[in-house]
């Protein structure tokens, strides 16, 4: 379990957002929305994990 969470965190930290900004406004908007949802899901999962522990 813990390994997957660490992997997700590294993916978020090393995500190449500056290169994606040149692709176009629609693509960037969808991408940012996806990353935002992904981050909020990850934060919720981490909170749930602390409750379990």
Curated annotation (Swiss-Prot):
Official protein name in the record: Putative uncharacterized protein Q0017, mitochondrial
Primary place of residence? Answer: mitochondrion
From the broadest rank down, the organism's phylogenetic lineage runs: Eukaryota, Fungi, Dikarya, Ascomycota, Saccharomycotina
Q: Which domain of life is it from?
A: Eukaryota
Instruction: Please provide the record's keywords in A-Z order.
Output: Mitochondrion
- Native source organism of the sequence: Saccharomyces cerevisiae (strain ATCC 204508 / S288c) (Baker's yeast)
Q: Where in the cell is it found?
A: Mitochondrion
Naming one, the record's GO cellular component terms include: mitochondrion
């Amino acid at each position: 379990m813990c390994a997957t969470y660490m992997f997700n965190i590294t993916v978020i930290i090393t995500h190449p957002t500056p290169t994606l900004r040149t692709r176009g406004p629609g693509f960037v908007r969808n991408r940012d929305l996806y990353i935002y949802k992904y981050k909020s899901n990850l934060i919720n999962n981490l909170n749930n994990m602390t409750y379990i522990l």
